[in-house]
From Swiss-Prot:
PANTHER family xref list: 40S RIBOSOMAL PROTEIN S15A
Keywords: Ribonucleoprotein, Ribosomal protein, RNA-binding, rRNA-binding
Family from the record: Belongs to the universal ribosomal protein uS8 family.
Protein name: Small ribosomal subunit protein uS8
Residues forming coiled coils: none
GO CC annotations, alphabetized: ribonucleoprotein complex; ribosome
PROSITE patterns attached to this UniProt entry: RIBOSOMAL_S8 (PS00053)
Subunit architecture: Part of the 30S ribosomal subunit. Contacts proteins S5 and S12.
SUPFAM superfamilies: Ribosomal protein S8
Gene source species: Methylobacillus flagellatus (strain ATCC 51484 / DSM 6875 / VKM B-1610 / KT)
Amino acid sequence: MSMSDPIADMLTRIRNAQSTNKVSVSMPSSKLKRAIAAVLKDEGYIDDFSVQDVDGKPQLNISLKYYAGRPVIEKIERVSRPGLRIYRGNQEIPVVMHGLGVTIVSTSKGVMTDRKARDAGVGGEVLCVVA
């Protein structure tokens, strides 16, 4: 079975795992998924992530984070999708919850948060929003 949107699948796996209070979640790995996981870790939304080979295929394992028994990630949504790509300039990147959340953007300088993209003066594809 081919997967038409692996990023949406990643976000859905995280959302579903947190709704059932799982400690970790695993999924097929890619460079983009690892970059998104690195941004989530830097922003404090997940504890850690690692890549392991399972039957010769890389698997991304994400350790989820909870605070007082509740998931740290309250909202995680895909913005740009294969059927409708969303690109924004550095001043047009949306701000999530007045700066309390982050928008993850894929730029020419790598995957980064909306704040870092504005500081670097680059725009790009708006991958997802996390709050």
